Amino acid sequence: MYKFVLSILLVATMGIFAGCTKYKDQKKAVSGFAKVYCDESFKNILEQEISIFEYQYPHSNVMARYMSESAALDSLLNKNVDLIITQKDLTQDQKRYLASKNRAYRSRMIAVDAVALIVNKNSDIDELSMQELTDLMTGKYRTWGKIVPTKLRNDSVKLLFDGNASGVIHYMKEKFLKGKDFSFPVYSAKSTEEVFQLVEKNRNAIGFVGVSWIADDMGESAKSNEERFKQLNKSEQETEPTAIDFTSRVKVLKVRSMDRVQGVKPYQAYIADGSYPLFRKIYAIDAAYPGSPSHQFFVFLTGVIGQKIILQTGVMPGAEPVRIVDVSN
């Protein structure tokens, strides 16, 4: 088994920590109520970001709403919210629309996420190729036995997604169906947690979830906000590496690219070098006024600590370089 140990390489800059007095003043300056709309598949990460942000800046409060990607984008354009997290950057038409309304915006890739394939932990299926996935997604074959050698032979394949308008299902449709709808019924769960529950109960099911939902952070979640903040705030020389394994609730499948003889699981190293083929970029899009609470949270997400939090969830940070160390057991 392989565990990948990653740590962020931070460029030391003068004046970051200028003293306790300045830091206390900064804590008071960053205050107020921020609002962010986000795709459900990124919820696990955003909740951790909010928890540390509110600990660091106790006079701040962030309200997150989780919805479909299209609903979040519409809300930004209609000025119902000024900060969203989505897997798509703004189109040229959307940029022109914001400009016509005199709304300045900032867009930053904050992460490279991956879509993980999960099956019942007692399943004898370990790997799917991109061609086999294509056959599943297009409905060419509807029973497991026609896809891979398995004891499930005549069992129908049950595809499970975290909602019919989520970023995950949009990504898979664009990847395999050129954006078209499925030609057969698929199951849209009410949440990512329900996808896990259904996979645990149904041996013929295969679920599609954001990779942060399968990551076992090796004890990070058990730490208090104070402990996590102290660790996140360490200099490069003191930064502890992050060891990521996967949850034992389900089996995480390997995925094999067309040009490879062996599949890989969505470890950060394989996401980073492109070996794991089901990866997607995640963007934070901020149209808030500079200095406003929503903009301050955007700055946090794209800064050093925000990127370290992303690293600890099994996802690749988008704004900071990382060092990857392969540790074999």
Protein language model annotation of sequence segments:
Residues 7-16:
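Bacterial N-terminal signal peptides
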Residues 20-58, 62-70, 74-77, 119-329:
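Exported/periplasmic ABC-transporter solute-binding proteins
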Residues 70-101, 214-217:
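Pocket-flanking alpha-helical
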Residues 110-113, 278-280:
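Short, solvent-exposed loop/turn segments at the edges of secondary structure
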